[in-house]
């Protein structure tokens, strides 16, 4: 269970009450279907059936999608050594070659994910991968499964034309809020994860609105202190991608020009993500001695800090204190030292702890963060479910492509 382990700032009952009311409003509004996911039997039934079918047929699965159609699933895949999932998400000339490297395409399925069914990067990636299969003399269409909202979209029509099965996505669950839907759960099932545990974790998060409201007060207080960079520092090596997923969720939901009434939007922070000791050797210097415009949120896992066999002996004098201890202990020590050093230098911090980021832990963390971001959007008067700033670039890219 996720909890606040260490906070330098007290929360008043008045502030918490306002956040509780805002969180209740946004979750009860029905504007987004993400809070409903744990109780939607169809989502879990389809995820299990489709994921199991793909698992029986194929040894590997390539997921084509970008942004919310990919990042959350990548988080899940990163927690299983030897994952059989590959991801085609970015547009570059060598992406397909990298993704298929070492794969036997004859036993590799393809899951194409686009909520709108018109994301040009996803459609282009599908074309590029199709041509790769065709050059290898391997049938492509019969190895595909499509996830999309509308069968009348470009992707939906293409799938119908080639008799490719389609799983329809709920129209009220946006991409960045969709990881616990079929978008993330079908690949998770393929990779052997326990879907029921994800579901339990999400249910646990929904039963703890008071905890989410307390988190909301912490972040709102950081905005009031003019801390406009929120740095999520994950101290679990398996959570490298989780920071990128959270970065998208936060930025697209809270970075708005206008509020719901069409007035200039209140400012929300820019998210950044860091990983354990790696970023103690990259961005820590700037955080400690740079401007006091950052709120550092440590996310620590008890399981990560107990992993590894004890070091029986060392051949380095500097490592003698580690003898008899695991690498997890070293990770824990560095995390605590980092917390203490930032506090001593006057940097605002918050530490969140969870026992283990397994299926249940991931389900809880992901639902908690989605509730947090939606609640912050509501209390700031923003729409946390749209992304109007992204649309202009899409339109310009299509115009430029026609002229290229």
Protein language model regions, located:
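Extended, charge-enriched "interface" segments that sit outside catalytic cores
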Residues: 1-52, 312-322, 337, 376
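Non-transmembrane, aqueous-exposed alpha-helical and coiled segments at domain scale
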Residues: 14, 136-137, 255-256
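Acidic catalytic cores of enzymes that act on phosphate-bearing nucleotides/polynucleotides
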Residues: 33-36, 75, 193-197, 207-341
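A short, well-structured juxtamembrane/interface segment
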Residues: 39-55, 212-223
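Hydrophobic alpha-helical scaffolding
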Residues: 40, 86-89, 115, 119, ...
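Glycine-rich phosphate-binding loops that contact phosphosugars or nucleotide phosphates
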Residues: 52-209, 395, 399
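Flexible loop/turn segments at secondary-structure boundaries
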Residues: 69-72, 94-95, 118-121, 152-156, ...
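C-terminal amphipathic alpha-helical interaction region
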Residues: 382-404
């Amino acid at each position: 269970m996720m909890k606040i382990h260490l906070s330098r700032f007290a929360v008043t009952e008045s502030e918490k009450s306002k956040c509780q009311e805002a969180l209740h409003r946004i979750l009860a509004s029905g504007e987004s279907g993400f809070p409903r996911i744990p109780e939607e039997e169809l989502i879990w039934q389809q995820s299990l059936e489709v994921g199991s079918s793909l698992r029986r047929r194929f040894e590997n699965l390539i997921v084509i999608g970008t942004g919310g159609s990919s990042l959350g699933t990548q988080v899940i895949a990163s927690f299983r050594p030897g994952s059989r999932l590959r991801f085609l998400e970015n547009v570059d000339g060598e992406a397909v070659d990298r993704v298929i490297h070492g794969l036997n395409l004859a036993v590799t399925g393809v899951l194409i994910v686009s909520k709108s069914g018109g994301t040009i990067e996803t459609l282009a990636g599908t074309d590029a991968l199709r041509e790769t299969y065709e050059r290898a003399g391997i049938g492509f269409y019969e190895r595909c499964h499509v996830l999309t909202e509308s069968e009348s979209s470009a992707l939906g029509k293409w799938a119908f034309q080639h008799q490719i099965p389609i799983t329809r996505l709920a129209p009220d669950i946006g991409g960045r809020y969709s990881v616990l839907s079929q978008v993330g759960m079908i690949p998770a099932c393929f990779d052997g994860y326990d879907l029921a545990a994800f579901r339990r974790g999400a249910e646990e998060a929904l039963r703890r609105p008071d905890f989410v409201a307390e988190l909301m007060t912490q972040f709102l207080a950081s905005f009031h202190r003019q801390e406009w960079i929120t740095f999520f520092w994950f101290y679990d090596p398996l959570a490298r991608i989780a920071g990128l997923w959270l970065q998208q969720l936060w930025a697209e939901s809270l970075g708005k020009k206008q509020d719901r009434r069409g007035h200039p939007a209140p400012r929300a922070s820019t998210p950044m993500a860091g990983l354990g000791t790696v970023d103690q050797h990259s961005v820590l210097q700037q955080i400690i001695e740079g401007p006091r415009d950052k709120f550092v949120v440590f996310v620590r896992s008890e399981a990560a800090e107990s992993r590894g066999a004890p070091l029986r002996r060392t051949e380095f004098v500097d490592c003698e204190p580690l003898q008899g201890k695991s690498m997890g202990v070293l990770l824990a020590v560095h995390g605590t030292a980092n917390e203490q050093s930032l506090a001593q230098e006057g940097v605002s911090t918050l530490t969140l702890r969870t026992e283990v980021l397994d299926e249940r832990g991931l389900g809880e963390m992901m639902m908690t963060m989605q509730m947090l971001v939606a609640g912050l959007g509501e209390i700031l008067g923003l729409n946390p479910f749209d992304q109007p700033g992204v649309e202009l670039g899409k339109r310009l890219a299509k115009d430029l492509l026609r002229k290229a």
